């Protein structure tokens, strides 16, 4: 079997590829061979370091570690799971990508290299409490697939060698009483330092097009809105994408500032509907929809934004997001609801029915008009609508 390195062509790990690697973190399909770790206290001291042949660990421990590793590949692509690319300068000389490649190629057997990695992590990562740095090395003999997607376990062209890093908080278990079977009594429970599921992690190299991509990695953050630039930018040397929540705020600001007085209900509703349509079309590819500056401009244009207002768009986009940065469509649009809000009320409509809600001037007052069917509930009580009531309210 050979090893492919991937190209610099812009491609990201998709959901299927993440799932394929995640399935390796089970006892039945496990291809992990070496585990290393460093327990760090709140004062940044190394308390203990360890290295083990992964499959020689007690079975219960193996299952606990596999839970941690699976967690670091969970969540939503573009939110908790972020595809990150190394800038070209990090692939040369003493660049971060070079040092990660050396770490992977050592199969975590070089103590000097491991120490250097732990030192860099401790120096750059800010965590106010105790935490555990976990590193695991694996070798996946990638099975070939038939044209109908069936795996051929006995046929393989490439081996995917990788390292997975997880940063797990270590916290004191809760105080309380417990039953002691030896003394047959209820007593104060001894509090233990427990390893929690990871808050940050990364998989290197990326697994793209069912192969190795040394130009990228997959980053995990438990909280999609609190990424860790200490790790992503300083330790890994990658360009950190804008957090999911901030992408939505920036997109909303771009629309409001670009459209100005033309930021009317119909245009905003069209943007929402067109965006959801694009997301649905992209679902077939198994990869989340990513929009660059020109694609966002086309979206506004298609949704009825006046040409005169779009002259301001590029400036607004560059200021809010960045000329070369992209946004994930799922981060800027909620495909599950369409919401209209005023200080007095909130109206939520399923996105498919958004076209039913209109704005009209009635007796000189701007109103929101929603057609009613015969299925109307008020505080859970089914009510009947008389024709004269409906007509009277519309007059």
How would you describe each model-predicted region?
Residues 1-12:
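Short, Lys/Arg-enriched N-terminal segments with co-localized hydrophobic residues
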Residues 14-17:
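Extended alpha-helical interaction scaffolds
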Residues 19-28:
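Short N-terminal leader segment in a subset of presequences, especially plant chloroplast
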Residues 27-29, 33-334:
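Long, hydrophobic alpha/beta structural blocks
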Residues 301-395:
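C-terminal, beta-strand-rich globular interaction domains
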